[in-house]
Amino acid sequence: MALGQKGTPMGTLRIADSVHSVDALVFDKDGTLFDFQTLWGGWADLLLREVAARVDWAGDPGSLGAWIGWDAERHRHDPAGPLAAGSMAEVLAAVATGLYRSGVPWHQAKEAVAGARRAVDAGVDWPSALRPVAGVVALLTDAVSAGVAVGVVTADDTAAALMHLGVAGLAGMVGAVIGADLVSAGKPDPEPVHAVCRALRVSPERAALFGDTASDVRAGRRAGVTVVVGVAATGESAALLTEADLVITDFSQVLLEP
């Protein structure tokens, strides 16, 4: 087995004609490890309905979706919007702002959103909602076999991310998770990527980063990782990943060898 920095196992990452030696794979969570629509689409619909039910407001719950980049009617998200690229705190603040702008007092809006989030999270069927992107489980398995470290950097809260990974049966293959609550500046700032690399004891220059948003790509670029790979489920999302070195549609296009 080849050895990389500080004697750690080194893998060879192949994507089409691109070949890179890596000590770690770093993944975004939502839209990269897990299908975004399945995980957050239903959650967003439930959240907006629950929020509307908690305040004296005659508006359409679906209209609040515009504040987070969620089209409830077409069941589609904006890959550049808060739901896709923002932290949970930012998403909740955006919904509360939408309520406030429609006439709900700010303190009531905040209370309604916080309570709705707790209620929805408690009622979600997480095993059904957490659908790994095609090929990602095989890639993680190959990483474990090759001794290549795996990290996750997410705009979600760390505890929620750990729960999601555990429910999906992936937690044992991930060496470190950095959520938005563990850093002072989230993606596109490089801080989360640097933090996960420190936790994995690898240099960013020896890591590959996979992400589905422009924030992911820019964070990896600024952190100085060896290769930034965009994960684009649709042409619309691919158009936002122009700063990536490579763009894939799923992980069946990725090969990791010892």
Where are these regions (language model features)?
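N-terminal helical cap/lid subdomain that shapes the substrate entry/recognition surface
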Residues: 21-134, 145
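Compact structured core domains
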Residues: 126-127, 140, 149
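Small/polar loops that bind or transfer phosphate-bearing groups
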Residues: 36, 152-153, 211, 232
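Asp-based, Mg2+/Mn2+-dependent phosphohydrolase catalytic module
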Residues: 2-25, 53, 137-145, 158-258
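Residues that cap or flank secondary-structure elements
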Residues: 87, 131, 153, 184-185, ...
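Conserved phosphate-coupling serine/threonine residues in phosphotransfer and NTP-handling enzymes
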Residues: 32, 154-156
